[in-house]
Amino acid sequence: MKAISRVLIAMISALAAAVAGLFVSAGTSHAGLDNELSLVDGQDRTLTVQQWDTFLNGVFPLDRNRLTREWFHSGRAKYIVAGPGADEFEGTLELGYQIGFPWSLGVGINFSYTTPNILIDDGDITGPPFGLESVITPNLFPGVSISADLGNGPGIQEVATFSVDVSGPAGGVAVSNAHGTVTGAAGGVLLRPFARLIASTGDSVTTYGEPWNMN
């Protein structure tokens, strides 16, 4: 009986440890700061761009075509400018993908989003020309979408899916469940999300995330 009790206790302890590990893993996966990169530009400002909470949810394609990959993208991109003249910074914040595909005949990518799926984060809209007291996200009709022909594979292509004008020393953009598809790709498709900050002076810095497999 003592031997059986020891076995049962060992099994329960192992199961509890496995469950605890599962909860820890699920709680930290794709949450928080994913990646960042900094650059000192020509005006001695430090430009930093970051990706946060990136999640690409690959789903079974609605057209049931074996050559189609479909996903929904959620996440945030932030930028920070430090140094002389940071308050006067102006530029563009871009989000997009590097897309890798092993074989294809004319791959095409489609990506779309509508407000309130996209939101300016930490943007200053209290001064001219807005003079508002809170952040608003007006509707875009019928929405915004991009479509691009990636050509024949194999290959790696980079596509900027959307961009926003930014100003000031810090800010960001958030996107929730933006819809994307790749058509005409045989085999697995890898998506590497990126965020890019481009200053009005032409300086730019890009941070790339881990690749996501859209099988």
From Swiss-Prot:
One of its GO terms (biological process) is monoatomic ion transport. The keyword Secreted applies. The keyword Metal-binding does not apply. GO terms for molecular function: porin activity. It comes from the Bacteria. Keywords: Cell outer membrane, Cell wall, Ion transport, Membrane, Porin, Secreted, Signal, Transmembrane, Transmembrane beta strand, Transport. InterPro entries: Leukocidin/porin_MspA_sf, Porin_fam_mycobact-type. Its main location: membrane. One of its GO terms (cellular component) is cell outer membrane. Induction: Constitutely expressed. It is found in: Cell outer membrane; Secreted, Cell wall. Residues 1-31 form the signal peptide. Disruption phenotype: Single deletion is viable, and shows no effects on glucose uptake. A double mspA-mspC deletion takes up less of the antibiotic cephaloridine, glucose, serine and phosphate than the single mspA deletion and grows slower than wt or single mspA deletion. A triple mspA-mspC-mspD deletion grows even slower and has reduced Fe(3+) transport compared to wild-type. A constitutively expressed secondary porin, forms a water-filled channel which favors the permeation of cations and less efficiently phosphate. There are about 2400 porins in wild-type, 800 in an mspA deletion and 150 in a double mspA-mspC deletion. Octamers. Probably forms a goblet with the wide end on the exterior of the outer membrane and a central channel. It is not known if mixed oligomers of MspC with other Msp subunits form in vivo. Belongs to the mycobacterial porin (TC 1.B.24) family. This is Porin MspC. The lineage of its organism: Bacteria, Bacillati, Actinomycetota, Actinomycetes, Mycobacteriales.
